[in-house]
Design a protein with these regions (language model features):
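Juxtamembrane extracytoplasmic segments of single-/few-pass membrane proteins
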Residues: 1-65
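Short coil turns that delineate tetratricopeptide repeat
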Residues: 27, 61, 95-97, 131
Length: 148
């Protein structure tokens, strides 16, 4: 793998939190904790959203929505290892509306941890999914992995 300067890693691994959109798949009534947490998330109060999202994720174990936004909040508050764990749980949930984005944010978090190989794997999988993040994944991949 290519040696990437720390300041370049910091730039490439920076995330822009996704907007919250109600998913048709997660159309089950959301908990009061989840709704309150997502109000904090919308206000960009990521640390204020964490407790409610943790409670919602525990209460709705079959829904990955709370886990996904919890992961984003953890990443935004520099709790990278917790964010990585939550993203891995979302990915383990299989084919959901959050799968591609979870892989993308996981790639960014792994890159921030200087785990270039792990980021490489996630970005390749995203490209193979041919979803809406395909081009972004290919662009980021080209910047971290040398072309043969």
């Amino acid at each position: 793998m290519r040696e990437i300067p720390p300041e370049r890693i910091e730039l490439l691994s920076r995330i822009e939190p996704p907007a919250y959109e109600v998913s048709a798949v997660d159309s089950a009534p959301s908990s009061r904790e989840f709704r309150a947490a997502m109000e904090e998330y919308r206000k960009r109060n990521y640390s204020g959203a964490i407790a409610g999202l943790r409670a919602a994720a525990a209460a709705q174990s079959k829904s990955v929505e709370a886990s996904f936004y919890l992961a984003i909040c953890l990443l935004m508050t520099n709790e990278r290892s917790g964010g990585i764990q939550e993203l891995q749980a979302v990915i383990a949930g299989g084919s959901t509306p959050y799968l591609e984005a979870a892989r993308f944010y996981l790639a960014k978090a792994l890159l921030a941890d200087r785990n270039i190989r792990g980021a490489d794997v996630q970005l390749r999988v995203i490209a193979e999914m041919h979803g809406k993040l395909e081009k972004q994944a290919q662009t980021l991949h080209a910047q971290i992995v040398p072309t043969p």
